[in-house]
């Protein structure tokens, strides 16, 4: 390995100037469109009127009761049980679609009784058709008056509202007969006065009003338009909701544009040779002697990070297994009632999601800490102390947030539910206080990384070089998490969802992907496997097409959540284009496989490369193919919020980000663990177990159920595909039961990683260099 002690940069002309300009231009345009689209959403939000009254002037609802109902919905973690406007979890119903069905049937019965003295279902087909058409016209007319900020409901609509209230009064007191516990919402959970976010009146009435309001906006036309606030979603012909022309047109247009850009991107890729080039000659593969590799105290301290990561991964998977079981036996766990009472579906789902983010992010943070001295060339003073502080901060964060989420969802925190408890938004369950701790933890990590790579940044003359790209991508991790602070329970649910997807799509799926692309490039250069020059060019190309498609591609989450129709066009086109960079990663996987083969039997990083190859394959299959399947507006219209969504979610979250987290986790452990304690054979078994198990989950369980659910929605209306009766069908129950097989295979792989990582703690190498001492490592800052 080369020893580089130079600290004075040599000023040279900027490299890759054109590629840099294209990337910067792409970022400016993409985020401008996204923010402008967000402003468009804000201006077109469905109103929450100051007063909602009936034909006689009696006040039925207020803005406070609607907003308070949203807070109640979030406080009891109902987004981790069912869905609202199609977003959330899949055990319970979609509350919007369910309420719309009840609201519509209530209006039909009211009209039938008024005109014929009979209930709607007792009428002849001809009379039913007359009533149905009358109800559709009445409910789709927008009676909101903007100057007075009031909404008038007709007699039939008022009756429909009362039916919705009666239904949810029963559900939230006696349970829903499926997975929702009786007596979930209690007035004793909140103080009588000065409630945080929740209105002073009865909480069940408030949540009923909120759910009814989502049904109203899904069936009421936008002013001056012929589609509803939700672009005619959910599909319910009795309510007049059918697929819009925009959904059909943009589905076809997006595929056409995809085909065009596949050709363009592939031409550019091959014409300008934008792939990574090997840095070694055939037969002269780099030799790695890990016993002689320099090691610092802070690097050794990352060992405990990965031991905790393995345990978090195991616990997260066990919660996943519990959730899968609840679909078979929703009211207990093999007859043990106290487990369901202690860990109901909603709380377990929140833990499952949060732990996934925690273990994946912690793995990436640990690798960043390890890499910092390699980049900077020395260990900063007291770096190890900062690493220890961050470690214990993460322990407090994970433990504290989980306890808080449980206490909040169970109603024990009173007015502090949002601050310390369960925030109630999928993927952002942890309370606001814990969010602050998480953000501070990421800033501490960024400071640790900056201290480690600071001298490398100074030495690298190119401000767009590999070290700078690593630093910029590190900054983006805490920066983009800031979107989680832009909304609260009082924010309109559609606007909250706009910012929530910044966390899920932009932060997890976008910035994590950016960091992964840069880190993979860094690792390959650090190991002398590829040239720095070709790697930097490749990274710029990948980031341009990744962010150019992905930033605006967030719009496929905005099709039917109350956002403006423009997002159907933007989201469909750019989400289709997201497939292209993911496809190109398969070419990278082949190159990685070839490098591993060239390394032969003695190549020490085989386990890392197995998981890097897994990452690339799942990037195409899980994120690309399965994402493309559900992102077409015409498919999403019927599928939105069904089992095909978690099929994509598992393939992308675990298949891409999870597999990559394991890759960097094993890379770091390989460098800090004694050679005699390493066993690639067991890690190979773990890799196959995780991939086979994940494949089984997705293709044997989630996809088949999702296709059946899609068919049910198309034939009988969306609400029917989300009713408990669908999940209770024999064929669905059989598929859900057989999931135990791939789940068990998957868990076996995790157990191997847990044992391996904890065992590694007792076989760590000793630091070879002290703080401030120069490390004999390849100088990534130097020009080739």
Located regions from the model:
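Soluble extramembrane regions of membrane proteins in the secretory/endomembrane system
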Residues: 44-246
């Amino acid at each position: 390995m080369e020893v580089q002690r130079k600290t004075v940069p040599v000023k040279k002309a900027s490299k890759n100037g054109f590629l840099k300009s294209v990337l910067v231009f792409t970022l400016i345009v993409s985020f401008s469109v996204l923010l402008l689209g967000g402003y468009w959403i804000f201006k077109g939000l469905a109103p929450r009127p100051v007063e909602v009254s009936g034909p006689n002037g009696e006040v039925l609802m207020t803005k406070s009761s609607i907003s308070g109902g949203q807070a109640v919905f979030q406080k009891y973690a109902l987004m981790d049980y069912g869905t609202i406007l199609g977003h959330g979890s899949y055990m319970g119903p979609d509350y919007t679609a369910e309420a719309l069905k009840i609201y519509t049937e209530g209006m039909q019965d009211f009209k039938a009784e008024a005109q014929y003295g009979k209930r709607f279902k007792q009428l002849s087909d001809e009379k039913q058709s007359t009533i149905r058409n009358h109800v559709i016209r009445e409910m789709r007319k927008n009676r909101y008056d903007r100057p007075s900020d009031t909404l008038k409901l007709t007699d039939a609509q008022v009756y429909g509202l009362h039916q919705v209230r009666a239904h949810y009064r029963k559900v939230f007191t006696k349970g829903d007969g499926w997975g929702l516990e009786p007596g979930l919402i209690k007035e004793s959970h909140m103080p009588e006065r000065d409630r945080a976010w929740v209105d002073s009146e009865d909480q069940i009435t408030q949540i009923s009003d909120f759910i009814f309001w989502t049904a109203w906006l899904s069936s009421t036309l936008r002013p001056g338009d012929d589609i509803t606030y939700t672009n005619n979603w959910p599909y319910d012909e009795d309510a007049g909701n059918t697929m819009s022309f925009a959904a059909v047109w943009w589905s076809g247009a997006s595929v056409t544009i995809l085909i065009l850009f596949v050709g363009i991107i592939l031409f550019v890729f091959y014409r300008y040779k934008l792939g990574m080039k090997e840095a070694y000659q055939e037969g002269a593969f780099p030799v790695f002697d890990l016993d002689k590799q320099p090691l610092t105290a802070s690097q050794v301290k990352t060992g405990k990070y990965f031991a905790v990561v393995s345990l978090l991964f195991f616990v997260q998977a066990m919660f996943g297994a519990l959730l899968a079981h609840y679909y078979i036996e929703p009211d207990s766990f093999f007859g043990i009632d106290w487990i369901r009472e202690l860990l109901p579906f909603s709380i377990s789902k929140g833990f499952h999601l949060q732990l996934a983010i925690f273990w994946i992010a912690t793995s990436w943070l640990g690798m960043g800490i390890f890499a910092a001295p390699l980049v900077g060339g020395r260990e900063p003073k007291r770096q190890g102390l900062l690493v220890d502080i961050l470690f214990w901060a993460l322990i407090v964060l994970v433990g504290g947030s989980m306890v808080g989420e449980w206490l909040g969802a169970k109603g024990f925190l009173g007015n502090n539910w949002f601050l310390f408890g369960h925030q109630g938004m999928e993927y952002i369950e942890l309370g606001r206080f814990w969010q602050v701790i998480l953000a501070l933890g990421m800033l501490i990590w960024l400071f640790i990384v900056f201290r480690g790579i600071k001298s490398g940044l100074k030495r690298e003359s190119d401000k767009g070089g590999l070290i700078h790209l690593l630093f910029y991508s590190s900054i983006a991790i805490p920066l983009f998490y800031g979107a989680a602070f832009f909304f609260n329970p009082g924010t309109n649910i559609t606007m909250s969802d706009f910012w929530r997807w910044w966390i899920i799509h932009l932060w997890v799926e976008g910035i994590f992907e950016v960091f992964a692309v840069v880190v993979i490039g860094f690792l390959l250069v650090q190991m002398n496997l590829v040239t720095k020059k070709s790697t930097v060019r490749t990274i710029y190309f990948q980031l341009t097409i990744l962010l150019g498609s992905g930033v605006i591609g967030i719009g496929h989450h905005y099709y039917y959540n109350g956002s403006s129709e423009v997002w159907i066009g933007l989201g469909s086109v750019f989400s289709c284009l997201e497939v292209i960079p993911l496809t190109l990663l398969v070419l990278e996987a082949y190159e990685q496989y070839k490098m591993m083969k060239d390394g032969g039997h003695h190549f020490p990083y085989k386990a890392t490369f197995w998981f890097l190859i897994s990452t690339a394959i799942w990037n195409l299959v899980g994120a690309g193919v399965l994402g493309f399947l559900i992102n077409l507006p015409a498919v999403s219209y019927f599928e939105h919020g069904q089992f095909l969504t978690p099929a994509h979610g598992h393939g992308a979250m675990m298949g891409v980000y999870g597999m990559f987290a394991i890759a960097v986790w094993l890379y770091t452990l390989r460098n800090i663990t004694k050679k005699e304690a390493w066993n690639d054979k067991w890690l190979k078994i773990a890799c196959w177990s995780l991939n086979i198990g994940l494949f089984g989950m997705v293709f044997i369980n989630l996809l088949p159920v999702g296709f059946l659910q899609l068919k049910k929605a198309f034939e009988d209306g969306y609400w029917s595909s989300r009713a408990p009766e669908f999940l209770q069908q024999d064929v669905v129950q059989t598929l859900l039961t057989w999931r135990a097989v791939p789940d068990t295979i998957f868990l076996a792989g995790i157990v191997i990683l847990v044992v391996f990582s904890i065992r590694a703690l007792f076989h760590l190498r000793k630091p070879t260099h002290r703080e401030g001492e120069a490390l004999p490592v390849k100088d990534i800052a130097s020009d080739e």
